[in-house]
């Protein structure tokens, strides 16, 4: 863990708040990629280290290691590439707070695409505006009936959005 942190923050132990304000620095390489440089690097060093815990109101729980996040994000990369997503594309996510959000966001980082997280409470007009204003190429959403209906209603007004699986 220290190796990963030191790669980007040469100093992270400080004597005081003033010391931190004066001396804290983050080194971000030009080719930095969070998916590869942090998530995958951590998975390579400590594959079984806990990365994510998910729970819901019903008491269900899922635990994911860094290896799980790496493997699931790599599967998501393959899916997104098959669907035509490439570096520079913009993808909107409406996935509530499910674990898949983190796998897909990490995958989009690995590809070099931009992610726009969006609320499941959006209405048709909100989708139309956001999709067109941002040039969204793909929208990935939960299967909730209301969300799906608002997305379907917005499609005729969103010419940039690929319509592979409406």
Residue map of PLM features:
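N-lobe entry segment of adenylate-forming
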Residues: 1-64, 68-81, 157
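Structural core segment of the AMP-binding/adenylate-forming
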Residues: 3-4, 82, 103-106, 110-166
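Residues that cap or initiate secondary-structure elements
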Residues: 32, 58, 99, 144-145
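Adenylate-forming
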Residues: 39-42, 69, 73, 91, ...
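A general structural motif
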Residues: 47-49, 88, 161
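Conserved AMP-binding/adenylate-forming
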Residues: 59-64, 78-122
